[in-house]
């Protein structure tokens, strides 16, 4: 059974609005009780969660289920290649302790393969509009992005 979980806590709510993290955790625990359930955690890596992937990994590790990281390709302005260099450095630093997990090195290599920071204006426009429509602020949950929103 694949459980699609992109973040924990309030960041989960932001990405999967109007998700409720305590409900997700409760449901996850119920799934874990199923007899012979082969559970995997699938995470779509994107601009909103790359800087907090370490938190998701730390939440997931005690469960000892496989964690798969899939990279969001569209819309391009949410792709991790759009991160400015200083945030790519920060993301890599936060993921460094988890290089032994499948695909973590691939995520880092992919992120550095190209510079799409020219798309940051589109990222900002989309995020500002999303925040207005939901009465939320990305920077409340990912303050590292405040300079770019």
Feature names for model-found ranges:
Residues 47-51, 66-95, 104-120:
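Flexible glycine/acidic-rich beta-alpha junction loops that bind and position SAM and/or redox cofactors
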Residues 15-17, 38, 51, 80, ...:
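Generic signature of intrinsically disordered, low-complexity segments enriched in small/polar residues
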Residues 28-35, 60-61, 87, 91-98, ...:
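Hydrophobic, Leu/Ile/Phe/Ala-enriched alpha-helical segments that form helix-helix packing faces
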Residues 10, 25, 29, 40, ...:
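Glutamate identity and glutamate-enriched acidic tracts
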Residues 1-70:
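Radical SAM/AdoMet-radical enzyme domain recognition
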């Amino acid at each position: 059974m694949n459980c699609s979980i992109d973040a924990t806590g309030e960041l989960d709510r932001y990405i999967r609005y109007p998700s409720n993290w305590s409900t997700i955790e409760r449901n996850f625990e119920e799934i874990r009780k199923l007899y012979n359930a082969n559970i995997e955690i699938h995470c779509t890596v994107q601009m909103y969660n790359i800087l907090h992937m370490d938190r998701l990994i730390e939440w997931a590790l005690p469960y000892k289920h496989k964690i798969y990281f899939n990279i969001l390709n569209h819309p391009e302005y949410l792709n991790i290649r759009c991160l400015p260099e200083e945030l790519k450095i920060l993301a890599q630093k936060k993921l460094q302790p988890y290089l032994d997990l499948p695909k973590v090195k691939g995520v880092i290599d992919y992120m550095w393969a190209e510079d799409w920071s020219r798309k940051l204006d589109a990222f900002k426009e989309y995020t500002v509009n999303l925040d207005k429509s939901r009465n939320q602020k990305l920077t409340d949950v990912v303050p590292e992005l405040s300079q770019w929103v």
